[in-house]
Amino acid sequence: MQLGFAIDQRTCIGCHACTVACKTENDVPVGQFRTWVKYVDSGEFPDTTRSFGVMRCNHCTDAPCVKICPTQALFKRDDGIVDFDNERCIGCKSCMQACPYDAIYIDAQTNTAAKCNLCAHRVDNDLEPACVVVCPTHSIWVGDLDDPTSGISKLVSTHQTAVRTPEQNTGPNVFYLGADQAVLDPLAAPVDDTYIWAKPDAHRLETAGDLPGNPRKGSRTTLNTAHPRPWGWKVVTYLWTKGIGAGALAVAGLAILLGIDFGVLGDYVAPALAIFGAATTGALLVLDLKRPERFLYLFLKSNFSSWLVLGGYVLTLFTGGSMLWILAAALEIGWAMTTLAWLSIPASVLMAGYTAFLFGQAEGRDLWQSPVLFWHLQAQAVMVGSGALAVAGLFLDLSDEAWTLVIGAFVVATVAHLVILLVEYAGKHASRQAATAAHVITSGRYAKTFWMGSVVPTVLAAIAGAVAWAMGADTTSTVLVALAGLVVQPALLAYESVFVRAGQDMPLS
């Protein structure tokens, strides 16, 4: 059984009765919506048209929000409804990143995720959803799409229909009849400086110039709802802090396996950086929750298909291993140090790279779906981790061998980071969403931050590191690589800032 909707835009009059009925039935806060009507105007006066599109959750067959939700607060019922339990929700907002339809919001009253649930409480009592009942033109159909005898199945099977973003392969169960493609395609109709009754929200105005639009039709959105970026500076910073921790421990572990004595830098500084990185990362993630008091639900109500949960376990185990490292060094237990060194490599790889799998579950953010992101995170981690070790090494007595390893790791990782940037932004992208976001980074609103704040300083740091490597481990080279190690820290933060923001700037509705 799969309950779903069919929206007949041929008969929809854009009256908003469905929106009002939904808000009343479900006590939806002011300014938030489970269903809404989007207006798109096309053409030029006097040859203009206005198209409507009823937007809502698509109750996907393969719902990405269910997969990414760390606490099973979102779940798929036996009747196909994607429902939510706000008693389990921690407000991590990952579901908002996973949904390609802008259907999920954080309820202002409960600080938990909410969305259209097909009025499940009414369905359970053999009643139709409120929007279906109130629609004056019977433009909203509901029923079992798996039952060929149902009215909705007959309607869908006998008419040409369309779905939103079919390329995401989520199996959407909201079918549109007679909908203008400019309504369904979020890139086709940017906003102007005003809606028909109000100003667009600041985020839509900020990003309107990024969108390619449809020059032939001149389509523009004249009514829509606000969808601000769910993730901000805390997630940007988290990408940097966990990179420092993972990279520092990986280089120290490699030194032990190669028989290079790092002294205090390897015994205490590297694991301390690892603990700092992991602990700060965890703190940032908890602070970013809308219900931070529920953070333990991540472990008590776990959904093990979510990389938020798996990442939480990686952070915990990584921190524990780093603490054991310091203990083994203090007690001078050689075999334990060797064992931990072997374990540090895969642990650091997971620590740095699990975000690639988490972002891979964020189906609504095509820029983040990069096939090279995992390797990019590894290069970034070693770059900032070895850079931090180089700075600390200035104040410690390091052998020439140790300096050579730190400098070499820094140069190789920094060059790898730059090469992957070239591959990522000079190559083709898998979707228009990703290509548009990449263009915004390299040539649009974020170009100055990307080039002058990140790429140029990183190139200079790579050159400085290469010169230091060629000079050998003397006082000048160590100071040079330490300065380069300092430079790449804000440079990486600048890149992560535009990467995280641009991925969320592409509209989904």
Q: Predicted segment positions?
A:
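Ferredoxin-type iron-sulfur electron-transfer modules and their immediate structural context
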Residues: 1-82, 87-90, 96-98, 102
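Flanking helices and flexible, charged tails adjoining ferredoxin-like Fe-S electron-transfer domains
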Residues: 41-56, 87-88, 96-98, 102-226
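Secondary-structure capping and boundary motifs in well-ordered enzyme cores
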Residues: 61, 87-91, 108, 127, ...
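N-terminal signal-anchor module of multipass membrane proteins
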Residues: 197-261, 502
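Long, contiguous internal "core" modules enriched in hydrophobic/ aromatic residues
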Residues: 230-233, 237-244, 256-262, 303-306, ...
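Membrane helical hairpin/interfacial module
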Residues: 251-314, 321
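Juxtamembrane/interface segments at transmembrane-helix termini
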Residues: 289-290, 422-427, 497-508
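Multi-pass alpha-helical membrane architecture of UbiA-family
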Residues: 297, 301, 439-443, 503-509
